[in-house]
Amino acid sequence: NVTNMIADAQWKALPNYFGDSIETGICVVDTSGSMWGDPLEVAVSLGLYCADKCRGPFKNHFITFSSCPSLQEIRGATFAEKVNNMSCSGWGMNTDIEAVFDLILMTAKNSRCKPEDMPKKLYIISDMQFDEARTKYDEYSHKPTYKAPFMQQMKQKYKNAGYEMPALIYWNVRASHCAMFHDTFEGEDCCFVSGYSPVLFKNILEGTEYVEVTKTDGTKEVK
């Protein structure tokens, strides 16, 4: 199939947005019905890209969006098959971030993963608000309840096992504008992103700190 051959060639020709850095990331990919359309395409694309760049036991794997997350191997001989299989993966109505961190650590320990092969970033890609995708939140302030104590405890758990905890990046791909900020979790290593664009995709993977906003005339501006 010529179309599949072209897609495979284009996929293999993509640049390494992580650059010379040893940093890699693993994705929690929301494939629920509400993601249909551009959000699902963004989620699957980033999930496949990061899985391809991962090392050790995380190579060619992604994590399901579920209260009981699982590490799934990407199946398929062609790019089209991989996209289809990931798009049809299991999903839930929310995701338990603590369970995701525990899953990554358990996988690393069970496979005796080298510290340098541990993903440095955890991307959670969904169309839900951050609060809606968590198992615990304040219903009055609508702010996460997993603050510094949770993050500190999780970091210590990773440190005790000889690893560094991945930085958390929550990406809401349904929003109509793009924004990145780092003031949540009381200064802990956590980032919220909303919207999507090629510029945003590139900068997230490169770890660039910026804000891209949609102006009243509909154009986008990166600051």
Question: Can you say where each PLM-predicted feature lies in the sequence?
Answer:
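Acidic, glycine-rich A-domain
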Residues: 1-223
